[in-house]
Amino acid sequence: PAPLPHEPATSLHGRTPGLAEEHFAHDGLITKHAVRAVALAALRPMPGQLFWDLGTGAGSIAVEWCRTDPTCRAIGLERKAERAANARTNASELTLPGQFDVIDADLAKGLPEGLPDPDAVFIGGGATKALVNQCRPRLPIGGRLVVHGVTMEAEMLVETLHCDLGGDLIRFGVETADVIGRLHGWKPARTVVAWTWQRTE
């Protein structure tokens, strides 16, 4: 397969999900590399498949999807212009031309018209039951939908989705060694709830 452009996506780091945050343009709010690795494990990108990243932010999940194979494609939807601009920069720097497209869209108003049907969908923030219900019928048999959240409201939503629709529900946290004065300790990140659903019929 054709190599992906730029060293961060190829020889130095390979294509395994979890590219360090320093390689992305972002405003400080970015899905951390360990959380991205968990998300991509659930999304299971396959060659030639199309991915929707809803509320793409810096586009880090979509970039990771595209890095797995040159034929993978992604569409990222983002409401905030500054974050959409960062996502476009990351698409240009870390994916092949035409592999990752970013669309300015307010998902509170629903999905924009004309989107091609995806093989997998990720909602990393701002998930609602209505948005989930819009996405589910667009997936093919075997398509994957993954929702992440860090708020109590998101946790209540995914618990409801899990009760109503099944799927897998996990909650996990990541702690990083950090300096405490002259000593060291563990600095926890926000706990993430993650719901994964696969269409079977």
Predicted features along the sequence, with ranges:
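Conserved SAM-binding loop of SAM-dependent methyltransferases across substrates and taxa
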Residues: 58-70
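Class I SAM-dependent transferase core
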Residues: 1-47, 52, 86-89, 93, ...
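C-terminal substrate-binding/active-site "lid" region of AdoMet-derived donor-dependent transferases
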Residues: 132-193
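Helix-to-beta-strand junctions that scaffold the AdoMet/dcAdoMet cofactor pocket
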Residues: 69, 96, 139-141
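Short beta-strand element of Class I
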Residues: 71-75
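Active-site segment flanking the S-adenosylmethionine/decSAM binding pocket
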Residues: 102-147
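Conserved S-adenosyl-L-methionine
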Residues: 55
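S-adenosyl-L-methionine
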Residues: 77-120
